[in-house]
Each structure stands twice: as C-alpha cells, then as structure tokens.
C-alpha cells in the first residue's frame, strides 16, 4: 500500500470514528507514513479517546507522538502484522470500519462535470421589519386574507364567492359561497360551529349533524386562522348551514424536471452539540458524498449528487427545551457551529449546499426567520458552494423548484388536527400545502412575526416541498408535488421520550431531479 493510500485510510478511520485531525496532527501522520502505519497510530488514538470521560472531537499531534512510541514498542514484542494488529484493536470501537470499501474502481462523480444551476426565488432575509404593534398584526392578517383569497378565486368554483356582508343580507334558503378566515371552531357531538370573518364582517356557519361524512371530515381538518371558502345555505335563524368546505388547494400539475441526471440530498436536524447527535452515522454520510463509503450501488447514487439541502436545526442550540443542558456535549453555541462547519467543509466543492435555520438555530424564533448570522457560520463564509438563506425559502435547482421550510408549525398541526401524527409528517405537510399556508395557526407553538407581507402564504406551487423538524422520515406525492420530510441525525432525547416518540435517524432521502424519484440511503 502506497503512503498516500495509508494516509487516506487513516483519515477515513478517524472520520468514521467521529473525530477530526487538526493540521499539525495531519502533518505528523504524513511525515511518519513512509516508515509506520498511520492507521495503527490512529487506532490507538481512537481507543484511548473512546475511554475518556471528557469527550473531545479533535486528535492533536502530541497524542499521536505519544502513541507512536507505544506502537514502536509493541512492534518489537509481537510478530503480528501492523494491519492485523490494528483490526484487533479498533474493531470493537469502530465496527463500521470494515464496511468502508475502497471499491473496485476509483470514484468518478458524474455531477462534478455538470455545471451548477441554482437560483434563489424567494428569501425573506433582509426584508423583515415588523415592530410587533397591534397595527402590524392587523396588517399581517389582512395581507394573509387578501393573498389567500386571490388564490381561492383562481378556482372556477370559487370565482363568484360573495362577501360576508352580502351573505348576511341574502334571503333565507339562498345558496352562496363566502371566503373567510376561521376565528373560532367549536365541536359538540356531531356539530361543528365556525366563526368566520373577512375584511368587513363576520358570520357563524354550522356544519350540521346530518351533514355527509365527507363534509364532517373536512370540518375536522380545519385549523384556526385558516382562510377557506364555504359553500353555505342561508337559514332563517341568521345562521348559515355549510354545504361544502373548499380549501385553496393545488391543482393537478406536471412538475418541472431536470434535463440532466443530477440528484439532490434532502436532510435536516443535524443537532451538532447534542450528546444524542449521531456522529458516526453523519461521518458515513460525509464519506459517502466523497465516494468513500458504501457499496457500488450507493456510490453510483452519490456520484450524481449535485445539491445538498439542509432544512434547519444545524446545531442543538442552548436553552431550547427544559433540561436540555444535560444532553449537550458543549454549551457554547459558537463551538456547536464550528463543529457543524467542519462537517460541511468536507462536502465536495462541486456540490452546492443550501442551509436554512430551524428553531434550534441562532436566529429569531418567529417566522419567517432570517438566515443564520455570518458570525456563527464564519468558517463557511469563503465557501462559494454554501448558501445560507432564510426559513422558509424557495430555490430552483436544475429547473426544479424546491420550497424549503424547517417545519415548526407541524407541531401545531399534529396537536390540533385529528388523525395527524409525528410518525407520518408528510400528511401534515400535505394539509399545509392544501391550505396554501406554512403556519396557519396563530398563538400555538409557532411564533409568527407580523410582517407587512405574509411570506408564509404558498403562492408558488413547488415541485418539491421539503421540511424537517419532526425527526421522522416521510414522503409522498400529491398532485405533482413531491412532499418530503427528511428525518434527522439525533437519537431519542429525554424530551422525545416524554412524548413516546422514536425518531428516524441517519436515513437520507435523495431525489433524482430528472425523474423526481426518491431513494432513501441508510447510514445508521
């Protein structure tokens, strides 16, 4: 084995075990490669570091020099070959080392020869200026109503909808349609009573006991502050009886597709800084992107990856949930981001990386969130292939439009809408898409900033709707839109355990942009 090959093997084993070499340590390994096996020294370093109570992510030169002396002494007293000795020493700590194959042929990434095609369609960063006054909130909901009303009136069956004021003046038994924002929802046995308002007036709408099961189902799925169209019959009592509920919806469409066979990796919720961060799995993921992990089929998938889209929660943050500090490997958020940057820097430079914040990141918690400050991502400032955008944002990659959203409001959907579950996040995402709004409910777990323009209204229908937050992998196709929740890289925390939720870890959806087919690549 040549010196460069021995050095590469040592570096791979370091990364797989979840550690990093600093510059001096790498230089030391390069120097000794001609006379010693660097992998043997790294094996001892991993064994020693794994036994320490105080964990560290970096291997320094002083440690390697000390361990080299042990290796030299050991070699004098044993006839075992260095490679064999290394395997015996390190396999218990690094079980995945044997799965990292050099492959039968050199990795030649197809995507490296393809020119990037990425355009930012929508990003709220730099456009946020609310003062949080009552007037701001009134303006915000008026804008939401107007934008969603416009989407509803694009439907043939809603174009002629009347204002609530006109509906109140209508004679009894008249059938008509109104557009309104739901301000109250009360359920009594088989009855649902809705309070609905537009910009001028308000009305009470009843979903009666004898309504069809389909209508009752639609009523159960309604959320507060959602803008919908209601087909009603005016009653003599002043109430209006619901005949149908119409969401803004998305029409059946043919999605855009790339003209070349390139792929996008969709991931999120890395949570560096957490003791539950799946470090080894994420290392395998980075190795895979570099063509250094997996079988030939996995490497073939990796060779076509041109984009990596990360939908928030890059770090675990500080003070996000009760007793979080007990599960932090570092309480310094700057260190958390530096560790995340170390990983992202190892993604090949021909791959374009898009990062948005989540509720654990160093950005304001209210939606929309501006991009993560450069002060935290300082190490990536010079990286020409890394784009730090706001949450949500829309990007076009090779002609395919992707709506990226961290997914905080999925908590509200799951907790308030019957039939929704953390185990099937794609169903909650589909409901948001049907509602044409990323966070309809105000006053729940999701904080909303009253901007003059409600950028959470889904005005452009994407080809791919990508979210995270829930830590559960799920995907489906709905009317030409690929809906994907990308799971995460954090094992079950005490907070998750409290709710009986088991996350999906280390499974990455990869979208072929030429066909929009989704392949899930496992790293756990």
Residue ranges and their predicted role:
Residues 1-524:
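Extended recognition/assembly regions associated with phosphoester-bond processing machinery
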């Amino acid at each position: 084995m040549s010196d460069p090959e021995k050095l590469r093997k040592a570096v791979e084993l370091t990364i797989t075990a979840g550690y990093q070499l600093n510059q001096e340590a790498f230089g030391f390994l390069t120097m000794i490669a001609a006379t010693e096996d660097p992998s043997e020294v790294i094996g001892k370093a991993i064994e020693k570091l794994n036994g320490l109570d105080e964990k560290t992510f970096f291997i320094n030169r002083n440690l390697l020099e000390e361990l080299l002396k042990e290796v030299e002494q050991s070699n004098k007293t044993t006839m075992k070959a260095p490679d064999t000795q290394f395997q015996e020493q390190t396999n218990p700590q690094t079980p995945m080392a044997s799965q990292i194959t050099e492959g039968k042929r050199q990795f030649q990434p197809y995507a490296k020869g393809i020119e990037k095609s990425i355009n930012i369609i929508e990003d709220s960063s730099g456009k946020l200026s609310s003062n949080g006054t009552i007037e701001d909130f009134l303006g915000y909901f008026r804008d939401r109503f107007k934008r969603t009303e416009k989407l509803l009136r694009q439907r043939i069956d809603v174009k002629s909808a009347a204002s609530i004021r006109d509906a109140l003046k209508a004679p009894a038994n008249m059938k008509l349609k109104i557009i309104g924002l739901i301000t109250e929802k009360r359920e009594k046995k088989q009855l649902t009573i809705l309070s609905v308002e537009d910009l001028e007036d308000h009305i009470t709408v009843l979903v009666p006991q004898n309504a069809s099961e389909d209508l009752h189902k639609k009523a159960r799925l309604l959320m507060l502050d959602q803008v919908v169209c209601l087909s009603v019959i005016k009653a003599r009592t002043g109430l209006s009886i619901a005949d149908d509920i119409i969401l803004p919806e998305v029409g059946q469409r043919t999605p855009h597709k790339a003209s070349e066979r390139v792929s996008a990796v969709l991931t999120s919720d890395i949570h560096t800084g957490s003791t539950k961060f799946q470090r080894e799995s994420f290392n395998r993921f980075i190795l895979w992107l570099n063509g250094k992990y997996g079988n030939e089929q996995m490497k073939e998938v990796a060779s076509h990856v041109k984009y990596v889209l990360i939908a928030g929660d890059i770090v675990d943050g500080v003070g996000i949930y009760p007793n979080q500090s007990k599960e932090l490997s570092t309480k310094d958020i700057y260190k958390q981001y530096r560790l995340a940057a170390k990983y992202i820097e190892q993604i090949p430079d021909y791959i374009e990386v898009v990062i948005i914040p989540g509720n654990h990141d160093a950005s304001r918690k209210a939606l929309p969130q501006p991009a993560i400050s450069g002060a935290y991502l300082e190490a990536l400032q010079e990286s020409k292939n890394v784009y730090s955008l706001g949450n949500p944002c829309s990007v076009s990659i090779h002609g395919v439009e992707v709506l990226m959203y961290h997914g905080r409001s999925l908590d509200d959907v799951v907790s308030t809408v019957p039939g929704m579950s953390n185990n099937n996040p794609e169903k909650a995402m589909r409901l948001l898409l049907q509602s044409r709004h990323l966070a309809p409910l105000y006053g729940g777990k999701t904080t909303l900033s009253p901007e003059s323009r409600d950028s959470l209204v889904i005005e452009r229908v994407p080809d791919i709707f990508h979210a995270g937050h829930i830590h559960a992998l799920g995907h489906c196709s709905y009317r030409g839109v690929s809906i994907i929740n990308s799971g995460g890289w954090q094992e079950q925390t005490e907070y998750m355990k409290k709710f009986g939720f088991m996350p999906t870890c280390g499974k990455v959806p990869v979208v072929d942009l030429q066909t929009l087919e989704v392949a899930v690549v496992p790293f756990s």
